[in-house]
Curated annotation (Swiss-Prot):
Gene3D superfamilies from the UniProt entry: Mur ligase, C-terminal domain, Mur-like, catalytic domain, NAD(P)-binding Rossmann-like Domain
Subcellular location as annotated: Cytoplasm
Record keyword Cytoplasm present: yes
UniProt xrefs under SUPFAM superfamilies: MurCD N-terminal domain, MurD-like peptide ligases, catalytic domain, MurD-like peptide ligases, peptide-binding domain
Residues annotated for ATP binding in this entry: G128, T129, N130, G131, K132, S133, T134
GO biological process: cell division; cell wall organization; peptidoglycan biosynthetic process; regulation of cell shape
GO cellular component terms, A-Z: cytoplasm
PANTHER family associated with the record: UDP-N-ACETYLMURAMOYLALANINE--D-GLUTAMATE LIGASE
Family: Belongs to the MurCDEF family.
Pathway named in the protein's UniProt entry: Cell wall biogenesis; peptidoglycan biosynthesis
InterPro entries found in the cross-reference section: Folylpolyglutamate_synth_CS, Mur-like_cat_sf, Mur_ligase_C_dom_sf, Mur_ligase_cen, MurD
Name of the molecule in the record: UDP-N-acetylmuramoylalanine--D-glutamate ligase
Function comment: Cell wall formation. Catalyzes the addition of glutamate to the nucleotide precursor UDP-N-acetylmuramoyl-L-alanine (UMA).
Length: 466
């Protein structure tokens, strides 16, 4: 665990007792802070009590005694309206920060008192609308394969303050959501990666401009940044950073870049002063199929170069990466039919990589629709043999599809798996693909995308070969 001494001897309020909140409370207490924790969910409060974390309903506390509110990233800060605990903190005029800010302050304290430099204990921060988790996991995997001391956490699922304490040459690879960045005013990573920016989480940020601004802070604060320039918003941001004098590199999965990193199909290149150097070829790496994974791999290789890390076996290490659960995860091959779990695709843009990668698709789609639905995926409609519509979005998506291709109102995931399997097995394609890429949130029928993905895997594994 990383101990946080920034509030030593002071009283802090903490709201949100999931994994990251519980870890933050323990880290603060070990650093000498007086913590009062609470959550709207009674189970979180119960867990905190079991871990000897002081709990009291913050609605009835004297907020003039607190110096800060430590807030879980899932709690609304501004939109659609501030949570009551945020209003309390603002009325008391105290700072509101999250667990990544506590990590940043603890690291800064360590660097100041140890005499080490930023690059002696590298902090890699990764953000973007889609691809964050894969890039985070792939970078950590390669560093581990090369023998480095690596700690991976943040939005990928491991609470950042549960990671091992700071020591020289330990590398921290951290996935950051826009919500976490909002709560991290001191964010200054050694290297910051921005993968892409498309409309998402507008319900929490109020506007796309506010969402972009949150993501921008990660790269503007970085000692060195890499930005994908395949998107107009990111290209403009890259140019802004260059004009402002930031150390920033360009990455493209679509076209040549003058100084930076780019992909030509499966081949990955770096370009420096007009000289092109091939870094790796992703051909036949099933866990890194698709142009989106070429971008993820480019970001990882760019980071390694910035860290001055090289290894002659880099392709072997890339090939050994197994991929993440729920992200274009190959579940099973049954005869000529391939089953793919892409449950982490919670919006249209996140479904695009899978739809672009495969052909002869039997698409299971639906759930709780995001703004824009599946309109952005029309360019892939020619690849779809049939769709199986589930959840709240079924009727809406049926209207969008119209007569573009056949569809079934399956409504439930179990029905969809069985219907899609029957149709795919009868298909004469060399390899038919039953693709579960819902392009929607899961909350209408499942607790989260992980539970939804596990349900899909379970239904697929129960299928009997005929």
């Amino acid at each position: 665990m990383i101990s946080c001494t920034c509030y030593k001897g002071q009283k802090v309020a903490l709201f949100g007792l999931g994994k990251s909140g519980l870890a933050a409370a323990q880290a603060l207490m070990s650093g000498g802070a007086k913590v009062v924790a609470w959550d709207d969910n009674p189970s979180g409060v119960h867990t905190a009590k079991r871990e000897n974390i002081p709990t009291r309903d913050l609605q009835y506390e004297n907020w003039s005694e607190f110096v800060a509110l430590i807030l879980a990233p899932g709690v609304p800060l501004t939109y659609p309206q501030p949570h009551w605990v945020v209003d309390k903190a603002r009325q008391a005029d105290i700072e509101i920060v999250g667990d990544i800010e506590l990590f940043v302050r603890a690291r800064n304290h360590f660097l100041q008192h140890s005499g080490f430099r930023d690059q002696d204990v590298p902090f890699i921060a990764i953000t973007g609308t889609n691809g964050k988790s894969t890039t985070t996991a792939l970078l950590a995997h390669l560093l581990e394969q090369m023998g480095y001391d690596v700690q991976m956490g943040g939005n990928i699922g491991t609470a950042i303050l549960t990671l091992k304490p700071f020591v020289k040459k330990r590398i921290y690879v951290i996935e950051c959501s826009s919500f976490q960045i909002e709560l991290t005013p001191s964010l200054q990573p050694t290297i910051g990666l921005l993968l892409n920016l498309t409309s998402d989480h507008i319900d929490r940020h109020g506007s796309f401009a506010a969402y972009v601004q949150a993501k921008r802070r990660l790269v503007t604060g970085a000692s060195y940044a890499f930005i994908s320039v395949d998107n107009a918003v990111c290209q403009a941001l890259y140019q802004q950073l260059l004009d402002e004098g930031h150390q920033v590199g360009a990455v493209s999965k679509e076209h040549f870049v003058e100084n930076g990193f780019y992909a030509d199909r499966t081949k990955l290149f770096s370009v420096c002063q007009g000289q092109r150097h091939m870094l790796a070829d992703l051909a036949d790496m099933t866990a890194l199929r698709g142009s989106h994974n070429a971008q993820n791999a480019l970001m990882v290789l760019a980071t390694l170069q910035a860290l001055k890390i090289s290894d002659p076996h880099i392709e072997k290490y890339l090939a050994s990466y197994k991929g993440l659960a729920h992200r274009m995860q190959q579940v099973r091959k049954m005869g000529p039919v391939l089953f793919i779990n892409d449950s982490k695709a919670t919006n249209a843009e996140a479904s695009a990589p899978a739809l672009s990668t495969f052909n002869d698709i039997f698409w299971i789609v639906g759930g709780q629709a995001k703004e824009g639905g599946i309109e952005a995926l029309r360019g892939f409609f020619h690849k779809i043999r049939k769709a199986y519509l589930i959840g709240e979005a079924a009727q809406e998506f049926a209207g969008v599809i119209g007569s573009a291709f056949p569809f079934s109102m399956s409504l439930t995931l179990e029905n969809a798996v069985h219907e899609a399997t029957v149709d795919a097995m009868c298909c004469k394609a060399k390899e038919a693909v039953v693709l579960f890429s819902p392009a929607c949130a899961s909350y209408d029928q499942f607790k989260n995308y992980e539970v939804r993905g596990e349900a899909f895997v379970s239904f697929v594994m129960q299928l009997k070969e005929s």
